[in-house]
């Protein structure tokens, strides 16, 4: 049985009413998005549990085989996706979702999100999850294994709210790849809240503000 990844946690108060999972990008770790706890004020909905899972250490082909935190391998040919690695991490995130539900947080109060590789994992896992989630957040990433989604997607999350954000000058995941992912999701009937910002492969405060508003909406009691 797959174990959940080692995960950093922060609760903004006792008895949290929602859980927000944020997965980091290539070469980072769970602490990368810990500032969200202070930057995104969700007090209007009540206490929240933030979870920041750590990707496993593995060689990354496009970086010369250097071992670093990665949810999956990235090869030189963008079309050659590491399906085995993606599926392994999908299973680990499913285990994390199961752990959250086992300690009393219903799926409809869980937001699954991530940045770059973490965005890919949020879309891969969330759209196939068998129980309705509160929402999916994708920052500066793309839709992986897009060709399998129509057959594998979960009816429970057919109408899940999706927040997608991207930098117009992103040098790591080019904007057209992100807009193609958005268009593919919309073609399958998903409702996508799309945001583009004048930045590179990063997060800006305007984006954080927009994300806060979106979270307050999808997690409203």
Regions found by a protein language model. Give the residues of each.
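Primarily recognizes the serine-hydrolase "nucleophile elbow" in alpha/beta-hydrolase
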Residues: 106-157
